[in-house]
């Protein structure tokens, strides 16, 4: 291998990370990283559409922070003939989605790149004599910078709690498969550029 001929002055480990999409592989790899006191990590990732042997370098964020959000709102059931007697989360979740879209645009304009994707919304069931009393809004949210992403998530949580309280409903917010941002360090990027020119 090339590394055998390079005669490096320190050990180099090539690690294959399984389970990339769920983060499970990172847990396995972290044991070796800690055990061997590995101080620098360079990730290799295939990028479709680019020729084999090309080295693409990002001087900034390679992958955004992300998490799934499952927002479960709990109202009060009522007969479909008397919807005013219950609390239906449908309109609240619909407005909440629009409010989160507006927040996303505001953060993009003032603080940094964030993205919200609607994954799904379920309200009520196919019981036509009963007004909906349960609803779930599912989103995936992303952010280029960890600090901006954390602030964005806090503000989404505040919107959710406020929306539920305003209609006297209870709410649960669950984060699903949270991933940190992959932000590159400038000195490592420069080293990689220099090595790719050899």
Where are these regions (language model features)?
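Histidine/acidic-residue-rich, glycine-tolerant segments that coordinate divalent metal ions
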Residues: 6-120, 124-130
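Metal-dependent amide/peptide-bond hydrolase catalytic core
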Residues: 91-198
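Active-site alpha-helical elements of protease catalytic centers
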Residues: 1-2
């Amino acid at each position: 291998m090339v590394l055998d001929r390079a005669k490096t002055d320190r050990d180099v480990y090539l690690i294959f990370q399984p389970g990339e999409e769920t983060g499970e592989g990172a847990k396995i790899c972290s044991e070796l990283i800690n055990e061997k006191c590995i101080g620098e990590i360079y990730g290799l990732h295939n990028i479709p559409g680019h020729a084999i042997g090309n080295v693409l370098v990002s001087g900034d964020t390679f992958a955004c922070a992300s998490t799934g959000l499952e927002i479960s709102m709990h109202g009060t059931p009522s007969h479909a003939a008397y919807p005013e007697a219950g609390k239906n989360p449908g309109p609240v979740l619909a407005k909440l989605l629009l409010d989160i879209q507006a927040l996303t645009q505001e953060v993009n304009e003032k603080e940094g790149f964030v993205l919200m994707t609607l994954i799904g919304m379920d309200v009520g069931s196919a019981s036509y004599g009963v007004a909906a009393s349960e609803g779930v809004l599912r989103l995936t949210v992303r952010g280029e910078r960890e600090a901006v992403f954390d602030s964005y998530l806090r503000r989404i949580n505040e919107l959710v709690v406020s929306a539920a309280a305003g209609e006297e409903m209870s709410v649960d917010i669950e984060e699903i498969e949270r991933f940190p941002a992959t932000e590159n360090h400038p000195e490592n990027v420069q080293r990689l550029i220099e090595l790719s020119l050899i």
